[in-house]
Amino acid sequence: MDIANLIQNLKQTLQNASNERHLIELKNIFVKQHLLPLYDELKKSDNKKEMGLLINEFKQQIELITNQALVELNNKSDQIDLKKWANKTLFTPFIKNGHHHIINNIIDDIAQFFKKLNFEIVSGPEVVSPVYNFDHLNIDENHPARATADSFFINSVQMLRTHCTTTTAQVLENNPHKDIRIMSFGNVYRKDDDDATHSHQFNQVDFVWVKEGLTVANLKWLIDSLIKYLFGQNLKTRYRLSFFPFTEPSFEVDVQCFKCDLKGCAVCKKSTWIEIMGTGMLHENVLKAANINDIKTGMAFGVGIDRIAMLKYEIDDIRYLYSNNFKFNAQIK
């Protein structure tokens, strides 16, 4: 029995198959003619072991050749001759390309800044416990934000977060013995009436850095570096003492108006300064709530991404950022 010659004949036969069903039929005919009779001969053979091995090898080669032929047949059916059917004169409607939203672009820019400083970029749940939204952040029971008139409560133990600092509180609690460098971002919710400068939902970036030896000087250096990175200018900054429950001391950060050359304009409301973010050193009660060693100090800031977008691109109505107006979105890439 010349197996090599039979296999060669099978290859040539299967090349004539017009489709998968035809190919299987040709294979079955070959098996019936050349493989099955060998089993009858095996019964009469004096050397059943040797002949059995030969038959098994023959069977495996038949399956291998059939599978190869099937792959080749499928490849042929996938090849389309474009010249035969393509109509180059056929009208194709213009498809407008999409691009990242400016909110996403600014978040990406800030994330890249912090990645260069080895900060971890994290995000947390938007539905949180008041424990993390208020209690662990030194916001007492009489604070106005805890009222249902100012915050969205789902029930007594769940609410929509009013700031991304909730993620900070959870990270601090889960890593009390580590130096912490994180930037968190996401949607936050407050019961504001929607108008040109307010929205019940907006985007925020929050950062926290905890280790031994951090001071206000480190905080100022970091924020000044971020502002320069975002706006591409050596803008002057001003730190005004303020109050936030979770930081002490607390500051409002202003930048010198970059639109009017200190002449006063609509962007800075004629003051030549633009309020841009709140910041400060983490309050000792926030660190205690997370069981962090009192030797360590921490600093944090929170900034509204929507506000940064409005300042950077001179947008006078925050609602443009959410209106899905293609003409508006196409102007800013």
From Swiss-Prot:
Catalytic reaction annotation: tRNA(Phe) + L-phenylalanine + ATP = L-phenylalanyl-tRNA(Phe) + AMP + diphosphate + H(+)
Enzyme class, spelled out: ligase
Family indicated by similarity: Belongs to the class-II aminoacyl-tRNA synthetase family. Phe-tRNA synthetase alpha subunit type 1 subfamily.
Protein name (record): Phenylalanine--tRNA ligase alpha subunit
CDD domains: PheRS_alpha_core (cd00496)
Molecular function via GO: ATP binding; magnesium ion binding; phenylalanine-tRNA ligase activity; tRNA binding
Coiled-coil region(s): none
Cofactor: Mg(2+)
Enzyme Commission designation: 6.1.1.20
Co-factor binding comment: Binds 2 magnesium ions per tetramer.
Keywords: Aminoacyl-tRNA synthetase, ATP-binding, Cytoplasm, Ligase, Magnesium, Metal-binding, Nucleotide-binding, Protein biosynthesis
